[in-house]
C-alpha cells in the first residue's frame, strides 16, 4: 500500500495542477475509456437521492465537458482556481482497482486577485492501474459547498 | 520514521473522516484509556495561560463529549464539516510514544451548502503505539480561529 | 524519488512551522547563500510580465527582509498565520538540484481570533541538496490572491 499511497497522491496532484493551469484538453486523459464523473451535493448523497449537480457517464461526455473551454467558445467570468487535495486514503484494493478518497478544497480568485472558497468536498474514486499509469474509472465529487454561487464552468 | 509518517497521516485522515461523516460514537476509540483532549486559543498558549476553550481530561469525559451528539439529544444548528489535515510532522520519538503535530483547517457548510472557515489550528499530539494501532494520549488543538462564532458542538 | 518526496514535504512543513511560530530570524537559514525569493502575481506570470510584488535577489536581502520583524522595529497590525502546504511535487531532478512545486494556503487570524484567507498560491522552487539538508536556491511564490488587502509584512 505504501507505493500506491505515493503514486495516488502524485496522480491527484498532477490532475489538480492540470486543472489549475487550465490545461483542460488534458483532463479527459485522466479517465478510462469507460468512465463516470459526477458532482453530487452532500445533501442528496446523505439521503440516497440520485440526482447529481452534473454528470458525465461516458468518456465522450467527459471530452465534451471541456470542449467549449478548450475552444474558448464558452463565455463566462474567468476565475483562477487552486486545488488543495489532502487526506488521501486508499480504502480498498481489488486486483488492478483501487477505491480511494481525498478531500478537496478549491479556492477561486477573480481577475482582481480576490480569493474565496469555491468547492469544499470529497473525491470518492474508483481508480484502475493501467501499466504504469493510474486512471479514473469513476469519480464522485461530493460537495459540502453545494450552494455554489457560480456556475460549474470548469471541472473539479 | 518513514513508516511512522505514513501511519500517522493515515491515522489523522481516518480520525478526520470519522468526524466529517459524523460517526461520533467512534471518536473515543481514537484515544487511550488515560487521555486528555483540549482546545486552546493561540492567544492563551502564547502567554502560557492555562485556560482551555474546552477540555476533557479523562476517557469518560471524551465519551461524554459526544454522548449527546450520538443520542441526538442536543439541539443545535446542523452543519457539515470537512477536515483538511496537512503539514503532518513527527517531532520526537520515545519508545512507543510519538510527539507529532499537524495543521488542521475545518470548513463548515450549512444545510444550504454555504461554506465558511470554522477552525484554523494545529494539533499538538502525544501518540502511543498500541500493537498495530496508534492512539491519542494527549491532543491539544491550538486554534488561531478562537473568535469562533459558533458553539463548539462537535469535536475537532 | 520516494525519499526526496518525504524529505521535501518535511522541509516545506518545517519552513511553514517556522513562519507560523514567528521564528523569523531562522527564515534565512532555509536559503542558499546565493538565492532568490520572489512573490509574483499570477496575473503577471501568465502574461510573462516580470514585475514581482516583492523580491529578494541575494541572501543579504533575505536577511534584511526579516530584520525589522526580528528587532520589532516595524509597526504593523499583528496577525497569526497558518500555512497549509499541500500538493507537493518533485518536477525534475538534476544532480543535487530539484525543481519542485507545492500549493500554499495561508490563513490569517487577527488578535480577536477571526480568520480569513490571506495567501492562495503556488511555490515554484529550485531546491539544492547540501549534505543532509535541503535549501532553497530560488523560490517563486505565484499568488492567485494578489489583491491582498494587507501589506506583505511577513514572508510566505
Model regions: which residues?
Chain A
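Short, low-complexity N-terminal intrinsically disordered segments enriched in polar/charged residues
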Residues: 1-21, 26-33
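Short helix-to-loop capping/linker segments positioned immediately adjacent to catalytic or ligand/cofactor-binding
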Residues: 15-16, 71-78, 111-114
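A solvent-exposed, acidic/Ser-Thr-rich amphipathic alpha-helical stretch
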Residues: 33-103
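A beta-strand edge to alpha-helix "cap/lid" segment located at domain peripheries
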Residues: 84, 89-156
Amino acid at each position: 500500500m505504501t507505493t500506491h499511497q505515493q503514486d495516488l497522491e502524485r496522480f491527484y496532484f498532477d490532475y489538480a495542477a492540470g486543472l489549475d493551469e487550465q490545461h483542460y484538453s488534458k483532463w479527459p486523459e485522466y479517465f478510462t475509456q469507460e468512465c463516470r464523473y459526477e458532482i453530487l451535493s452532500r445533501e442528496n448523497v446523505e439521503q440516497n437521492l440520485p440526482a447529481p449537480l452534473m454528470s458525465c457517464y461516458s468518456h465522450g461526455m467527459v471530452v465534451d465537458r471541456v470542449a467549449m473551454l478548450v475552444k474558448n467558445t464558452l463565455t463566462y467570468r474567468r476565475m483562477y482556481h487552486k486545488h488543495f487535495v489532502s487526506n488521501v486514503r486508499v480504502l480498498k484494493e481489488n486486483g488492478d482497482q483501487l477505491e480511494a478518497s481525498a478531500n478537496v478544497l478549491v479556492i477561486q480568485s477573480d481577475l482582481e486577485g480576490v480569493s474565496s472558497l469555491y468547492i469544499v468536498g470529497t473525491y470518492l474514486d474508483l481508480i484502475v492501474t493501467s501499466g504504469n499509469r493510474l486512471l479514473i474509472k469513476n469519480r464522485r465529487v461530493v460537495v459540502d459547498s453545494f450552494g455554489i454561487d457560480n456556475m460549474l464552468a470548469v471541472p473539479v
